[in-house]
Amino acid sequence: SDKGFDHFKVKLSITVQKMVRSDLATSGVMFSIDTESGFRDAVLINSIYGLGEYIVQGMVNPDEFYVHKPTLKQGFKPIISKSVGLKRKKMVYDSKSKNNTKNMPVAKKDQARFSITDKEILQLATWAVQIEDHYKKPMDMEWAKDGRTGKLFIVQARPETVRSQDDPNVLIEYSLKEKGKIVAIGASVGQKIGQGKVHIIKDAKN
């Protein structure tokens, strides 16, 4: 109705899309804002091997890349940070399994190298900037690379709703009074500190 269409005259369409075989290559998520600091001039890209579900579930520590947006718009290649993730396993397509997917270990040599090239990092960052410019707000996006064709695809884009709501002129940091052994690492989804007991739930009835 916002576009003036009569709902009783609009016909439904069925879209048939070819599957992006990212299980044969890589996939990931990216943000047109730094999700840790709220810095708006950076694109954050995370990448893993196989289907992107493991990033969503937090099952795999991904590769992480930062690109400076203003310099990218000027035609330069401003990759300002690259970090190799562990990427010990991946999810791939399997027509014989009940869920049509299976888990596979990633070869040691592939774990130790970046899962996408600098050229692919810059292409994804360019798309992130274009998508943000189109929607006029920081965006949260998912992407996939087809292992058969080598092509990159944006498979989802939605507004980023956490850091984009913060005042960009204010940075609040929290720190622990005591330090301990680090048992897990990754990108944060918040800046505050929580505490409590850890309970291992082995069955839904518990």
Task: Report each predicted region and the residues it spans.
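Non-catalytic, soluble scaffold/interaction modules
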Residues: 1-206
